[in-house]
Regions:
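Conserved alpha-helical segments that form or flank metal/cofactor-binding pockets of metalloenzymes
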Residues: 46-90
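Generic structural signal for well-ordered secondary structure
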Residues: 11-14, 25, 41, 48, ...
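Generic structural signal for well-ordered, non-transmembrane alpha-helical segments
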Residues: 19-26, 53-60, 105-116
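Intrinsic structural disorder
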Residues: 19-27, 31, 41, 61-67
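A structural signal for long alpha-helical coiled-coils and helix-turn connectors
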Residues: 33-37, 63, 70, 91-94, ...
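Acidic/His metal-coordination segments adjacent to aromatic residues that form catalytic metal sites
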Residues: 2-19, 78-109
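Helix-loop segments that flank and shape redox-cofactor active sites
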Residues: 27-50, 114-123
């Protein structure tokens, strides 16, 4: 007797999504890690440091999921060139006076987008 699998996406579509999630988590950990030395405010440095760890854990878990979906685990892929360009622009916030822009770009733009994508995936 066979049982239908739960979910609406094919294995390939799920692998692409997971690859996108991994890519963004990896980019976030690198971006936040790079900003720690550039950010003068100690509370913001500590926040970035904690979230570097969280992003690393998430990227690792997504990477472990990829082989289960018959996809290469060594790296993720951006969902689109436009989104990759947006993340590159955010990564470019390197000036010392851009701490507020850094916080807003990650916690009001990228993280909410990631949460919405995760919620859609689970629905």
């Amino acid at each position: 007797m066979t049982h239908p699998l739960a979910g609406h996406a094919s294995v390939d579509a799920s692998a692409r999504r997971v690859s996108h999630y991994r890519w963004l988590e990896e980019r976030l950990l690198r971006i936040l890690g790079g900003w720690i030395a550039l950010t003068p405010e100690l509370p913001v440095k500590l926040l970035f440091g904690r979230h570097v760890w969280d992003c690393a854990q998430h990227a690792d878990l997504w990477g472990k999921r990829l082989p289960e979906l018959r996809a290469p685990a060594h790296r993720g892929a951006p969902p689109s060139e436009g989104f990759a360009h947006l993340v590159d622009l955010i990564d470019g916030l390197q000036a010392r006076h851009e701490s507020i822009a850094r916080v807003v770009s990650v916690y009001r733009v990228l993280k909410p987008h990631l949460i919405a994508a995760y919620e859609t995936h689970l629905a």
